[in-house]
C-alpha cells in the first residue's frame, strides 16, 4: 500500500490535507480521508517522514510542518506564520534539507525559511522578497505573480517562475536569504507557471499557464534558453482553459501536463536525452479542473485531483512503453483538491 497526500483550498468544503492509500495491485484508492485540517494548505512537499504545507490563520500566513507516523497519519510539529503579505501557492525544500522555499502568487513574493535538520521543524522566516519586474499585457498580469520556486539541478540557485512577468528568475541563497543572479524571458502573455527538470540537469520543461504551452529549455548556470515549444491542447479548441501541472515519469521517458477547462492531460514522448518532445495524445482527466496529479514511484499509476465540480480524484493505469494512461473504475472525492504528492 502506498500512502499519498492531497493539499486543498479551504474556501468551501476543503479540509486542508487529505491522506489516501493507493492499492497498486488493484489500481485503486482504498482509503481517502482527512489527514489534517490545515487552512489554505494548497501545496505540500515531503522530506522523508516530515510533511510541509502552506498555511494561514487569520491574516498571518506561512507554513506548517507535520510528522508522518508509521501508519501515514499526520501530527503537527510546528507552524511559522510570520507574514501578512499573502498565502503561498508552492513550497519546496533545499537539497541539504536546511531551507524551505515558498512562492506567493498574489503579491509576487518569495520566502525562505530555516529548518531544523534533525526534527524537521521550521525555525524561522529568513527573508521575504517581493518581485519588481516588468509585467506582460494579459489581463492577469497586472503585477508580478511568483508561482514556483525550487532548487536548480546544479544545486547553486533557486529558480522562480513569475506568471505576471513571463520569466524565470534565479537567485543565489544562503543563511542571509536570496541574491538575484539571472533572469530568462519568455513570450508576452505566456504566464510562466512551473518547471520540471530532466534528471540529466541539462534540460527543463517550462509550462505556461496563459498560452497553454510547454517549452523545452536548455539549462546552464542559472539561465534557461528555449529550444522548442508545444501546445498542450488541440489547436481547434477555443474554450476557456489554462494549463496547470507538469510531471515527468520516473523513467524520464514521458512528460505529462494537465489542462484546466479542457479538462485533460497531455502526454509527450521525451526524445534525444531530453532536448525534444513529441505529442503522444491528450486524454480526458475524468473530472473538472485537473489542478494537479502525480505518478506513483512504480510508474504504473497516475493520480489526479480536480479542484472544481465534484472534486473527484481519478486513478489511471499507465503504459510504460507508450506513456498512455487509462482511467480506472475508481474515483474518490477530495473537496477543492489542488496538490498530489507521494
From Swiss-Prot:
Family, similarity comment: Belongs to the cycloisomerase 2 family.
Alphabetical list of PANTHER family matching this protein: 6-PHOSPHOGLUCONOLACTONASE, 6-PHOSPHOGLUCONOLACTONASE-RELATED
GO MF terms held by the record: 6-phosphogluconolactonase activity
Protein name stated in the entry: Uncharacterized protein SAB1858c
Gene Ontology CC terms: cytosol
Entry superkingdom: Bacteria
Organism: Staphylococcus aureus (strain bovine RF122 / ET3-1)
